[in-house]
Amino acid sequence: MSHKELWNFVRIKKNTSKLLFIHTPKCGGTYTNNILYDLKIINKNLPVNRKNHIPANGNEKEITFTIIRNPVDRFESLLNFRLGMDIFEDWPQHLHYVYNDKNITLNEIVDKMSDDEILSFTPYKSLIYWTKNVDIIITIEQLEELLNFFDYFYDHNIYKKENVSIKSRGVFNNEVKNRISKLYHYDVLLYDKIKNSTFFHNCT
């Protein structure tokens, strides 16, 4: 069964073509939100608080969808993003000093984090958490195809990526990549499963 056949199955099962976006953090959501806003597609975050991330509960009448990305790239993006902001409450207390020393690399920072600290960022959480009860899971590369399938059309050339993290501390080396992959093992399995196809699990 092709991914379009799966999408059509969801549409028939829920008897609607209305979409509801579930914003998984650090997966291109800001860029996507700009497109969806212009298309008047509902976002689970809006209109209560555009910055909040609200998971699906499985009772939505609309077709819920979310976007995920490579879990290692996602975590690297999170850290680079955080290091460009003020210190968040969930940032490890013993690593506050790295904000004052730009020479400390991303790999050195991760090396000093415990596994629990790596897994405790919020509202970041795991891809498994954010995709629970979601009807359709895609990658950012599949966004335009999905929207077109449900009769939403836009010119992707007028939209630019936003909140792109500046990699001033470098990128992950292979050792750190392997560690993050193991810690987010199930996220990696999920991402690999839908990378070249679409996976849904709420309308079965």
Positions of PLM-derived features:
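Membrane-interface amphipathic segments in extracytoplasmic regions
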Residues: 1-204
